[in-house]
Amino acid sequence: MVIALSHLGYEKNSTLNYYDRGIVMNTRHIDMIIGGHSHTFLNYADYVTNLDGDKVPVVQTGSKGICLGYAKIKISKEGRLSFNYKLIPVKSHLDSKLDMAFSDMIDAYSATVSAKMDEVIGTCPSAIRKGSPESPLGNLTADALIWMAKEYYDVDADVSLYNTGGIRAEISAGDLTIGDVYAVYPFDNVLSIATMKGRDLKTLFDYVASSGGMPVNAGVRLVISGDKVKSVTVNGRQIEDNKDYKIATIDYLMNLGRYGLQNATSRNDSPDIIRDCFVDYFRHLAAENGGKITAAKDGRITKNQ
């Protein structure tokens, strides 16, 4: 039996090449897909036909722990599957009926984790906000990727790019802890360094413009008019179509296989989770600036109406 655990989304959308229903339609031998990403509440399994003409159940339980999914699968002696699925609402009034032995076990781990998460990296004199087309936190994030490429791989990246949706929280004024950094960058992405031709880099900036702006490094100057690129320079120069440029980004964007990134070469992915790399970067900033961590907008992205 093959059960696929997916975080692609239930139905096709504008940003993903693949999605749960489409995976079934274009494959064989998957017996069930348990999906995520789109936060779809499926009260009943959606049976989608695969390439062999078999009906494959696709299920998803919504979001925020509101429901549990229950699936009962039976395999006959002949190898045939029968399937029963339902959503079970999680009832908050049962919270008082905790298994104390289990709770005590969790508490022991929580104390260890909390001690690590509460470790102070530095101090932020003021809040560091996110937003589009440009923001202090977006700039800090993109510049961090440039630093990582140099620090870990001795690569002088020309461009860095981070997805706006990957920045999930803002940084408050005061002490910055490891837990705060994990809240800003909660996903298990990794640093990805690659080489792109200038023509593909232009395509990538078209995507940035159509998205209303995304975190890019200080070497970029991008002017957006409406949702189009009006002008863009890298390190003070126009982009040359046949020139090679080094880009530092994350595997999530690389794996989309779009916006010119699909043509990138010499890709190298870090073995380290990106949020731990951000912890290193913030430690570096604090060490260089008397314990302080700051960020600001500097005009790297301008949007004209």
Identify the role of each PLM range:
Residues M1-I3, D31-M32, P57, V159:
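Short, Asp-centered acidic motifs that coordinate Mg2+ and/or phosphate
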Residues M1-N13:
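Short acidic, glycine-rich surface-loop motifs adjacent to enzyme active sites
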Residues I3, I33, H37, I73, ...:
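Divalent metal-coordination and catalytic microenvironments
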Residues S6, T27, H37, G62, ...:
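Sec/Tat-exported extracytoplasmic proteins
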Residues H7-L8, H37-H39, T164-G166, Y252:
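Short, ordered loop/turn segments at secondary-structure junctions
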Residues S14-K116, G213-V216, V223-S225:
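Active-site-adjacent helix-turn-beta-strand microarchitecture at beta-sheet edges
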Residues V48-V56, C67, N139-Q305:
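Feature captures C-terminal
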Residues L87-L176:
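Hard-cation-handling environments
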